[in-house]
């Protein structure tokens, strides 16, 4: 996910985003490191994740070898 889009979602009333297929809420974004602090919707756990792991849908494209 783009850092500016992630920052927009912090202040929006948009639905959840997904980190590794799990619904999360973005709490903060560090644009310089391209990392975000997210909170799990399921259990409330907070973690730091790369913006590349955050999607606006729960579907992650898998590549088969």
Curated annotation (Swiss-Prot):
Keywords: Sporulation. One of its GO terms (cellular component) is endospore-forming forespore. The keyword Membrane does not apply. Its main location: other. GO terms for biological process: asexual sporulation; sporulation resulting in formation of a cellular spore. It comes from the Bacteria. It is found in: Spore core. InterPro entries: SASP_SspH. Signal peptide: none annotated. Belongs to the SspH family. This is Small, acid-soluble spore protein H 1.
């Amino acid at each position: 996910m783009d850092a500016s889009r992630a920052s927009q979602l912090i202040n929006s009333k948009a639905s959840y985003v997904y980190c590794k297929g799990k619904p999360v809420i973005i709490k903060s974004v560090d644009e310089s490191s391209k990392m975000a602090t997210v909170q799990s919707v399921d259990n409330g756990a907070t973690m730091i994740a790369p913006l590349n792991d955050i999607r606006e849908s729960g579907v992650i494209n898998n590549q088969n070898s």
